[in-house]
Amino acid sequence: MAAAPLKVCIVGSGNWGSAVAKIIGSNVKTLQKFSSTVKMWVFEETVNGRKLTDIINNDHENVKYLPGHKLPENVVAVPNLSEAVQDADLLVFVIPHQFIHKICDEITGRVPEKALGITLIKGIDEGPDGLKLISDIIREKMGIDISVLMGANIASEVAAEKFCETTIGSKVMQNGLLFKELLQTPNFRITVVDDADTVELCGALKNIVAVGAGFCDGLRCGDNTKAAVIRLGLMEMIAFAKIFCKGQVSTATFLESCGVADLITTCYGGRNRRVAEAFARTGKTIEELEKELLNGQKLQGPQTSAEVYRILRQKGLLDKFPLFTAVYQICYEGRPVTQMLSCLQSHPEHI
């Protein structure tokens, strides 16, 4: 007898979550391995007097977070988290990283023991020994195997089906290949590697570098300066991974889409860069700019810089990571944006 088709639930429905829902909803229609209905947990909000879940289920568009892109009709928005994940075999986590503890606590025990997860969440947490990855939190709280997906993937471009690459990191290769089958399309090409921790760390740390790039744009420094931010940021990303990742760190992973490609696209086209540029030019706070420019969605770069700053301070390593440190101090300690240039001029890479 053929195995029952695998039920998929997407946990999250923001900009990126909705773009991924478009891919998965379309793919499962022709893949017999997966159930043809995809549930998507939606944090209920009211938009123009209507519930967001009603809009998605009737008009098949997330008008708040991914306007202008139709979702397949087999993607069903569910406002109740427990109901959304019930009996799901495959969980796709795509929420702001600061909510992962609460979400895991709420759904642990409600999914089958053999369920598999993949996290698209770009962020890290602080643990007693320093670094704690989002995948570690999910694995420890829920007891399921978890893969990661990171890459040069601006959500609106993915939703518009413009060509891009991405990277899946999975410690169990067959699980990574299963998620590749679920997610790959002719215009969304996936490489699977086993260096999962490095893949995940790239996705978090590049947002800090992008904030630095945005500061430089706000100061009108030019392309040469931004190239230096990208290079020095990459050096700090590699150094951080080699210090804090428990397993082996392959430098080759930084050449995958999750590494240098994602870093470049985020430093030129992402929301972290855009908000950081506005921060440098307007003097408004990050919180004000989130409301103004991001429809209230949370920016990951500044928050990740705060977590990284605490981890580095705990280990006495702040002076080894001047770019990461400068981003935190400018965002949260009121240091002038020009400190970004000072940190580049005196970077230990040049000494």
Swiss-Prot record:
Enzyme class: oxidoreductase
One GO location term (cellular component): plasma membrane
Swiss-Prot/TrEMBL keywords: Cytoplasm, NAD, Oxidoreductase
Annotated coiled-coil segments of the chain: none
Protein's recorded name: Glycerol-3-phosphate dehydrogenase 1-like protein
Lineage: Eukaryota, Metazoa, Chordata, Craniata, Vertebrata
Cited InterPro entries: 6-PGluconate_DH-like_C_sf, 6PGD_dom2, G3P_DH_NAD-dep, G3P_DH_NAD-dep_C, G3P_DH_NAD-dep_euk, G3P_DH_NAD-dep_N, NAD(P)-bd_dom_sf
GO molecular function: glycerol-3-phosphate dehydrogenase (NAD+) activity; NAD binding; protein homodimerization activity; sodium channel regulator activity; transmembrane transporter binding
Annotated GO biological process: carbohydrate metabolic process; glycerol-3-phosphate catabolic process; NAD metabolic process; NADH metabolic process; positive regulation of protein localization to cell surface; positive regulation of sodium ion transport; regulation of heart rate; regulation of ventricular cardiac muscle cell membrane depolarization
Subunit comment: Interacts with SCN5A.
Subcellular location: Cytoplasm
Reactions catalysed, as given in the entry: sn-glycerol 3-phosphate + NAD(+) = dihydroxyacetone phosphate + NADH + H(+)
Primary gene name: Gpd1l
Active-site residues, record numbering mapped to chain: K206 (proton acceptor)
Pfam family of the protein (one): NAD_Gly3P_dh_N
Protein family (similarity comment): Belongs to the NAD-dependent glycerol-3-phosphate dehydrogenase family.
SUPFAM superfamilies: 6-phosphogluconate dehydrogenase C-terminal domain-like, NAD(P)-binding Rossmann-fold domains
Binding site residues for NAD(+): G12, S13, G14, N15, W16, G17, A155, R271, K298, Q300
Top-level taxon in the UniProt lineage: Eukaryota
